UniProtKB/Swiss-Prot annotation:
GO terms for molecular function: RNA binding; tRNA pseudouridine(55) synthase activity. Responsible for synthesis of pseudouridine from uracil-55 in the psi GC loop of transfer RNAs. Pfam families: TruB_C_2, TruB_N. The active site is at residue 49. This is tRNA pseudouridine synthase B. It comes from Rhizobium johnstonii (strain DSM 114642 / LMG 32736 / 3841) (Rhizobium leguminosarum bv. viciae).
Length: 310
């Protein structure tokens, strides 16, 4: 008989809201956090480009089951557009492909913004993670291929011009939905204004439902490595985690008893009839004694588990 496998890390669950520094990739950040926490598994809720800084929510352990609910949330970015150059990557990293001596006035910039608010059609950048015929667009672009990426609808809830520090740049804030490319906004601004443009600075300040104040700088986490006692170090790190349920705050919440929790963990539905039961059919999550038990569907007076938590 083979021996049972030992877990490769601690069975912790929670969210760390990392303030990612510039020149640090999202995958690299996840690996670093997983190692620091000695976690069994980890994953992030939305890539941030290496040249971008700011909020990168990282799920540890069972919290990785809640990643899709954060991926779909609203996001807020502050970004700077530099005028006069369009680049292959639509940011500072790429080669210049088009240039112009023209510069827009502040009023000209303000005049175009209403056209970018609401549900708009957007073509993702050539260097993006979009799949074309089974391959990532950025892989094809690196091989020198010019590819036709179909446009898609994205939601822009708010778009504000914050400042024009000089004739060559403008600073914006945007609140947007899933799948929006800020680099594509900069590209399209430049084309409409007839001066070309690219993102020269990008910071994400909000990923629903996590507030900006929840962010933890990477340097603060690394500093905890100086704690020699491993138990003390891990306790200090764990104190920075946000409860897994926080990612589900947009869903109806069922508070259940121990018997119901046992049924759900066995994969069985439970009855939710009663005065406090949600009326409409919907997705929901259930907790017992303050602990997340399951995410599931409510329908026909039952809660049916889809994802069960240890």
């Amino acid at each position: 008989m083979s021996k049972p496998r030992k877990p490769k890390g601690r069975p912790i669950s929670g969210w760390l809201i990392l303030d990612k520094p510039v020149d640090f990739g999202s995958t690299e950040a996840v690996s670093k956090i997983k190692w620091l926490y000695k976690a069994e598994k980890a994953g992030h809720a939305g890539t941030l480009d290496p040249l971008a800084s700011g909020m990168l929510p990282i799920a540890l352990g069972d919290a990785t089951k809640t990643v899709p609910y954060v991926m779909d949330g609203r996001k807020i970015y502050e970004f700077t557009v530099s005028w006069g150059e369009e680049r292959a990557t639509d940011d500072l990293e790429g080669d210049v492909t088009k240039s112009s001596d023209k510069r827009p006035s502040e009023q000209q910039i303000r005049d175009i913004l209403p056209g970018y608010i609401g549900t708009i059609s957007q073509v993702p950048p050539q260097f993006s993670a979009i799949k074309i015929a089974g391959e990532r667009a950025y892989d094809l672009a690196r091989e020198g291929e010019t590819i036709e990426i179909p446009s898609r609808e994205v939601d822009i809830f708010r778009l504000t011009l914050l400042a024009c520090p000089d004739a060559d740049s403008a600073h914006f804030e945007v609140e947007c939905g899933k799948g929006t490319y800020v680099r594509a906004l900069a590209r399209d601004f430049g084309r409409e204004l007839g001066c070309y443009g690219h993102v020269s600075g990008l910071r994400r300040t909000f990923v629903a439902p996590f507030a900006e104040g929840a962010m933890v700088p990477l340097a603060d986490l690394v500093a905890l490595e100086a704690i020699e006692d491993m138990d003390e170090r891990l306790a200090a790190l764990d104190a920075l985690l946000i409860d897994t349920c926080e990612a589900l705050s947009s869903l109806p919440h069922l508070v259940i008893n121990d018997d119901q929790a046992h049924r759900l963990k066995m994969g069985n539905p439970i009855l939710v009839r009663g005065r406090d039961a949600p009326v409409a059919e919907s997705e929901a999550y259930a907790t017992a004694r303050g602990k997340l038990i399951a995410i599931g569907e409510i329908g026909q007076g039952e809660f049916r588990p889809k994802r069960v938590f240890a």
